[in-house]
Amino acid sequence: MEQLLNITNEELPRETTAMARVFAAHVGKKSLSHQETMMRLTENLILARESGNSFITLEAEESAALLANPHFCRGEKALFHLEGSHLYLYREFHNEAALAEAIASKLQAPAPENAFSDAEIRAAFVKSGGPGTGKTTIIAALVTLEVKRNPGIVIEIAAPTGKAAELLTAGLAKACPEYPLKAETLHKLFKAQHGSGRFNCNGSNPLDCDLLIVDECSMISLDTAAKMFNGLKPGTRVVLSGDHRQLEAIGPGAVLDSLLTFDPGEREAARKLKKASTELTANYRSKLAPTIQELAKALREEDDVKLLTQRITNAASDHYCFKKSGKETHKEALESALSHWKKLPEVCAEITAGSRKQAFEMLKSFRIITASRVGQDGCIKFNEEIMKALDLDSPESPGSALLISQNCRRTALSNGDTGIVFTDSINGGVKVCFEHLEEPLSFHDLPPFESAFAMTVHKAQGSGFSEVFFPLPTKDTPLLTKELFYTALTRAAMKITISGTLEMVEAALMKKSCRSTALRKRILSQLEKADDEKKNL
């Protein structure tokens, strides 16, 4: 099937590859013309799914071809679901429909007694805002009010990745030290099964929680959001927080954006959703340097590509630098890396509390973030060059930085956690230290990992660094979007150097992410249905 679709096995996730093979077995029994039509639809759907879309839109003759074989697109055992001209994988359709019903149900729930604020009059509400707009402060205030009102309340706080959870925990510790709460990853909180991705907390075994607060929701895929809501008790209230202008989830769907993008012409039901949503715009306490703040604000609010390109390429300060890319790009990136990390191998010569703290501070002081993994401007290439420049022979060399790429409950490691390799002067050999773990780990205990000196913007999402070097690709790519550019810019707290051409900046700013999803439409339909039922009582 992979060969027929002109897609390599490596480009397909395991579940999609399996789906393609099952489908091939069915279409193999049909006529050649039918095979060609179905193969083309399958290829388009797989590629659309890999781009984050929940469905593809069919032409009339394509819909007719599917309807002529209803076992392909009707019923729970069908591979696909056809709704009008929209063709889904059945799983994506089910997730979208279930999530819409769950969110609408939360919005229809009665207000809690003695509500403190307008934000609390809904069982679920959404807030979005850029860095420094007060998202963590609002979460802290809500936690404080809820605990004072109901000391026995069970509150859970979560984020999609380990790094995002770690930063949220630290932020809440400062904002409300009297009520310390530890944020967990969604997969850990809902007890995800290793390998399958299923949550053990589900409709039959819901999470014991009265209030769930989830941060960095732009990173949550449709599949994860559906499983999360399915794993909640009917009375659990939900708060979703994030920045919907950042990159969307790697998987299909645009959950946060679907809840926050409003059309003035939308029907009455949209007002209920809008009332439950808040976009924070005022900047109260951003850790970002002024020039970075100003450019981030411009990216959020302006759509004039020419004007934005001029601002980005002409801005200059102690905190921001745009360099026209050339042969010196890699050399400049390596020079910056060495200025921050050249002593890292020396610091990692032994494991002490002081050396651990110093090593992680050094690592967080700088990062190279890239649009893609592969190619001359991909993170793999930069990592190879940095390892060589630091005289690190392998990932097991003291001073190497590792990025965990798979959740592992056994070791309490999550996708996105960063470790540093140290010499174990007591027992011999090397160990890997992680900030959130007291005891270092051996290499054989680690889940899959990669080098962490350079990472993709997707991997960096939810993290922050003092200084960032962001090399734009030399050729346009679908990955290069306005959302990716904005996310890269806001990873830097004190300084960012962007290396690229004016053409690549324009290419990024011209492409705004627009995923094919009907989640918002389904939520509004559910709300309208509930309103009609109330009127008929």
Question: What positions do the PLM features span?
Answer:
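Conserved helicase motor core of P-loop NTPases
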Residues: 119, 245-402, 408-411
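C-terminal accessory regions
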Residues: 417-537
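Interdomain "pre-motor" coupling segment immediately N-terminal to P-loop NTPase/helicase cores
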Residues: 60-116
